[in-house]
Amino acid sequence: MPERTRGFAHRIDVAIEPEYVWRALTTTASLRLWCSPAAEINPRPGGVFRANVDRITKLEAHIDVFVPERRLRLIYMPCPTLPSADSALVDDFIIEGADGMTILRLLGSGIPGDPAWDAPFMRLRVSWERAMTRLKDLLDGQRSKGASP
């Protein structure tokens, strides 16, 4: 029987154009402001994303989907500080803009339902929730200054 998996969803709404949200997701300097101080990205199809999501877990992902100002999907490589898994961990950032507003959704999936994953699941979910809040604050601040992230 296939392994049962779980996921999470986060959403922010910002009064800024999608291009600014995209830049915040795909430039190392911006990622370091809201995601992780050591974050790195090689923003292209097949590129790499690296970040410390918490003090324990350093993640590295392959950029599977790269559609400027629309979608960024990350497929994570196995991590030695996480329990083993038969499923791939995935984060899918989906950007939707209209009339000067942008909705950014983050859908995390593929996290094993095994009890060994309970604590890592909570750390990932909460860490991304906090990061998305920091991203919203960053983008709202940039909008009020009239500058890009």
Task: Give the predicted meaning of each segment.
Residues 3, 110-149:
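A conserved amphipathic terminal alpha-helix motif
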Residues 9-10, 16, 20, 29-62, ...:
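Short beta-edge strand/loop motif at the mouth of beta-sheet-based domains
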Residues 25, 35, 76, 139:
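Short, flexible helix/strand-to-coil boundary loops that buttress conserved ligand/catalytic motifs
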Residues 26, 102:
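Ser/Thr-centric signal marking residues that sit
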Residues 1-9:
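Short acidic N-proximal helix/loop "leader" segments that mark the beginning
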Residues 39-40, 56-101, 109-110:
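Hydrophobic-ligand binding "helix-grip"
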Residues 12, 106-109:
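Short, hydrophobic/aromatic-enriched beta-strand segments in well-ordered soluble domains
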Residues 24-25, 66:
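Conserved catalytic core of Hanks-type protein kinase domains
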